[in-house]
């Protein structure tokens, strides 16, 4: 049996929902080479027919039944997509009818609700949070009064991508502070952070993994030396423990998992956008 399986994320909007759910499902299966393709804004019959033809062609090319993860809200478009002969995984259909019965109300199909700019205030909050994260990245700005969270870690431990994810997906004003050699020498919380203890969250990382990351940025330097990485990580972890700062290792942890842990630990209640 071929291990190659074509998978299509089809949506009448951005395709983010279909791809996110589809990716989560596919990660439950090992030993397969999933060839994925996102088809966004499939919002009329002609586009749906073209999408169905692409899926069918992929099935013929690989001699295997394709998979379509579908988040189109229009049932007619879903019916056209099914003509591809693919295994259809409908993101919404299994849940809409039970909800209609429970709420005693019909759905109002609207394209792009999940990731469109339906609520301007919410969208504005996301943009402001993103601007905040960028302007408070790597200690650029040190005015933390408006921050919801301040990530603290040695250089290249995952602070920046986590802050950006928190801003984009939760509207969290996330700043980050890089621990310098001077900070680590004292093994005490840097003075500029002491008034914000309740907002602090420490990130740590396996020294060997940190060295790999730093080598990509500045190879064969003191910054990326194995001893430097071991010393910085060990000192930062002692500081976090001494100052009772909640911590999490980013070594084998996804940005999504890190973000969820930060939110739950600090008690930040935000809906995902």
UniProtKB/Swiss-Prot annotation:
Its EC number is 2.7.11.33, 2.7.4.28. It holds the Pfam family Kinase-PPPase. This is Putative phosphoenolpyruvate synthase regulatory protein. It catalyses: [pyruvate, water dikinase] + ADP = [pyruvate, water dikinase]-phosphate + AMP + H(+); [pyruvate, water dikinase]-phosphate + phosphate + H(+) = [pyruvate, water dikinase] + diphosphate. HAMAP family: PSRP. Belongs to the pyruvate, phosphate/water dikinase regulatory protein family. PSRP subfamily. GO terms for molecular function: ADP binding; ATP binding; phosphotransferase activity, phosphate group as acceptor; protein serine/threonine kinase activity. Keywords: Kinase, Nucleotide-binding, Serine/threonine-protein kinase, Transferase. PANTHER family: PYRUVATE, PHOSPHATE DIKINASE REGULATORY PROTEIN 1, CHLOROPLASTIC (PTHR31756:SF3). Bifunctional serine/threonine kinase and phosphorylase involved in the regulation of the phosphoenolpyruvate synthase (PEPS) by catalyzing its phosphorylation/dephosphorylation. ADP binds at residues 153-160. NCBIfam families: PRK05339.1 (NF003742).
């Amino acid at each position: 049996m071929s291990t190659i399986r074509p998978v299509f994320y089809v949506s009448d909007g951005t395709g983010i929902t279909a791809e996110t759910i589809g990716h989560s499902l596919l990660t439950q299966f090992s030993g397969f080479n999933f060839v994925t393709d996102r088809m966004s804004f499939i919002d009329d019959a002609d586009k749906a027919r073209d999408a169905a033809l692409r899926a069918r062609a992929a099935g013929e090319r690989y001699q295997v039944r394709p998979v379509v993860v579908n988040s189109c809200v229009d049932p007619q478009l879903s019916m056209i997509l099914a003509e591809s002969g693919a295994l259809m995984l409908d993101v919404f259909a299994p849940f809409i009818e039970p909800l209609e019965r429970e709420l005693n109300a019909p759905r109002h199909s609207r394209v792009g609700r999940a990731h469109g700019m339906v609520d301007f205030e919410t969208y504005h909050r996301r943009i402001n949070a993103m601007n905040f994260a960028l302007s408070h990245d790597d200690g650029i700005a040190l005015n933390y009064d408006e921050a919801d969270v301040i990530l603290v870690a040695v250089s290249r431990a995952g602070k920046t991508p986590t802050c950006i994810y928190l801003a984009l997906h939760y509207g969290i004003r996330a700043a980050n502070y890089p621990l310098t050699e001077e900070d680590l020498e004292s093994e005490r919380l840097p003075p500029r952070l002491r008034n914000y203890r309740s907002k602090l969250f420490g990130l740590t990382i396996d020294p060997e993994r940190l060295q790999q990351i730093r080598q990509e940025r500045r190879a064969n330097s003191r910054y990326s030396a194995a001893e430097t990485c071991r010393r910085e990580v060990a000192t930062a972890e002692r500081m976090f423990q001494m100052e009772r700062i909640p911590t999490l290792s980013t070594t084998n942890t996804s940005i999504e998992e890190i973000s969820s842990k930060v939110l739950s630990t600090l008690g930040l209640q935000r809906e995902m956008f």
